[in-house]
Amino acid sequence: MVKKVAIIGAGVSGLASIRSCLEEGLEPICFERSNDIGGLWKFSDHAEEGRASIYKSVFTNSSKEMMCFPDVPFPDDFPNFMCHRKLQEYIVAFAKQKSLLKYIQFETLVTSVTKRPDFSITGQWDITTEKHGKKQSAVFDAVMVCSGHHVYPNIPKESFPGLKDFKGKCFHSRDYKEPGIWKGKRVLVIGLGNSGCDIAAELSHTAEQVMISSRSGSWVMSRVWDDGYPWDMLFVTRFQSFLKNKLPTAISDWWYVKQMNARFKHENYGLMPLNGTLRKEPVFNDELPARILCGTVSIKPNVKKFTETAAIFEDGTKFEGIDCVIFATGYTYAYPFLDESIIKSRNNETTLYKGIFPPHLEKSTFAVIGLVQSLGAAIPTTDLQARWATQVIKGTCTLPSVKVMMDDIDGKVGKNKKWFGQSETLQTDYVVYMDEIASFIGAKPNILWLFLTDPVLAVEVFFGPCSPYQFRLEGPGKWSGARNAILTQWDRTLKPTSTRIVGDLQKPYVFFHLFKLFTISILFIALFLMLI
C-alpha cells in the first residue's frame, strides 16, 4: 500500500524529505507557502510574515564539501563559503536533478494538522490547506514538518526596562537587509550570535558607531582555519570527535579553549564566554576582531535599562544618542498549524526522540526534520534524518518503547545542559549524532572494516573531514560515487582559490595533523596522570 506523506515546507529539509519518500516508494505532497523553494536561503528584499528572512550580505558558515547533499557535490568552481545566491542556485539544481518540483504545491499555507478519530489504528492525519483564499482538506498517512526554526523572532522586550520610552528605531534582525539607511547613525545590536556579529561588522563601515551588547559572551571563529583551509574540513573530523569524547574532561576542555583562542585572546576583546568550556555553537565572523581593533565596534555587557536616547549597561557605562536598536536575539520554534499536544514541551525543552519523533504518539507517522542544531552543516543532517524518518513511516525501521525514548530524551537533556548550556536544548554533537542516526538505517561507516579492506579510504574517513559522502558509502541509498567524492574532496576545496597558480597545490597532510593532535593528547594525559 502506497503511503501518502504530507511535507510542510520546501526548504532544504523539505527537499530532502521529498527525495527520501521517493527512495522508499512513498507518495510525497509538499506544501510551500511561498512561490519558490529554498526556504531560509531564498532571499527577499523585505521580511515576510511566516517565512525565514536573511540579510543581503549573508554567507554560509559551513564549507561546500561539508554542506552538500551526500550524493550531489557542489560544482568544482563554486566558492567554499557562498552567498545566498550561489547556495540557492545549487538547491534549485538539486531539485531539478532529482525531479522534485512536481511534488510541490506552491503558495499553499498549511493551516491545520490534526489526528484523525481512528489515529490509534490508522496513524492518519487530517490536513487543511489554504491557497489564494480557498481552503481544502485531505487525509494523509504521515506528516513530515520541515518548516525550520528561523521564522518566529524572539524579542525579549520585558527584559529591558525603559525600552518602551526609547525614541529611536527598534526591530529584530530578521527585518535587517542592508546597511545603507544607517549611514552616519549610532547603532546598538543586542545579541552576539551570527546575525548580530554580521550586522554589526557590516554597519561599522558606514555607521558612526556600533556597539554590541552581550549577556554571556561567545567564541568567535574564523572560516579560515589552520594553513588557510576551511575551518570545518579540519575541525569536524571523526578523530577530533573521538578525542573530545574520550579524553578526560580537564584535557578536553583545555584543548577546546585553546582551539577557540587560536586566532586571538577573547578576553582581550570583551568576547570571552562566561563559561568558556561549554560547547555552545560559536559565532563565525572573519571581520569582527578587526572592527573591534579599529574601534568601529565595541563590545558591552547586558543592557540594564534604556532611556529615551541611550542605553545604560550593567557595568554603569552608557551609549548615548542611539538611533537604532537591533535585536539579534534569535528565534522561537512554533508550529501554529499544530495542536500543542503533538509536540510536547517541558520546561521550555522539546521532547522529541532524536530531535525528530514525538515519543507518545500511538503511531510513528509524524516527524520533525531539521530542528536540531549542531556544529555541522544542516543539509546532510536533514538528509539523514529524512532517510530514517521515511523508513520509520514505511515500517522498515521501528522506534523503541515510549519509556526507552523518554529515557533517551532525559539523558540527552542532561548531557546537553552540561556540554552546551541551559538554553541550548536543541544542540547536539554533530559526528556522534550523524553516526547514531546512520546506524538506525545501516548507513554508518564501518571504520574498522574500512581499515582492513580499503586503508586509503579509511584514513580519509577517520582522520579527514566528516563529509556527507561518508553516509552514502553503504546501506540503503548507497551512492557508487561516494568513495571517489571522499578521495577528491580536497581537489574541489582548492579549485576555486587556485585562480593564480604559483606552485603545486598543497593539500593538508593528514598525518601531520594526526601527529600534532596525538602528541598534545599524550602530553596532557601524562600530565593529568601525574597530578592525580
UniProtKB/Swiss-Prot annotation:
Binding residues for FAD, per the UniProt record? 9-13
Q: What's its top-level EC category?
A: oxidoreductase
Q: Return the similarity comment.
A: Belongs to the FMO family.
Q: What is the name listed in the Swiss-Prot or TrEMBL entry for this protein?
A: Flavin-containing monooxygenase 3
List the EC numbers from the record. Answer: 1.14.13.148, 1.14.13.32, 1.14.13.8
* UniProt catalytic activity: trimethylamine + NADPH + O2 = trimethylamine N-oxide + NADP(+) + H2O; N,N-dimethylaniline + NADPH + O2 + H(+) = N,N-dimethylaniline N-oxide + NADP(+) + H2O; hypotaurine + NADPH + O2 + H(+) = taurine + NADP(+) + H2O; (S)-nicotine + NADPH + O2 = trans-(S)-nicotine N(1')-oxide + NADP(+) + H2O
Organism of origin is Cavia porcellus (Guinea pig)
Q: What is the stated purpose of this protein?
A: Essential hepatic enzyme that catalyzes the oxygenation of a wide variety of nitrogen- and sulfur-containing compounds including drugs as well as dietary compounds. Plays an important role in the metabolism of trimethylamine (TMA), via the production of trimethylamine N-oxide (TMAO) metabolite. TMA is generated by the action of gut microbiota using dietary precursors such as choline, choline containing compounds, betaine or L-carnitine. By regulating TMAO concentration, FMO3 directly impacts both platelet responsiveness and rate of thrombus formation.
> Tissue-wise, where is it found?
Liver.
| GO CC terms | endoplasmic reticulum membrane
Cofactors that this protein relies on: FAD
Q: How does it sit in the membrane?
A: Single-pass membrane protein
Q: What GO terms are given for molecular function? A: albendazole monooxygenase activity; flavin adenine dinucleotide binding; hypotaurine monooxygenase activity; N,N-dimethylaniline monooxygenase activity; NADP binding; trimethylamine monooxygenase activity
| A Pfam family the protein falls into | FMO-like
According to the record, the segments passing through the membrane are 512-532
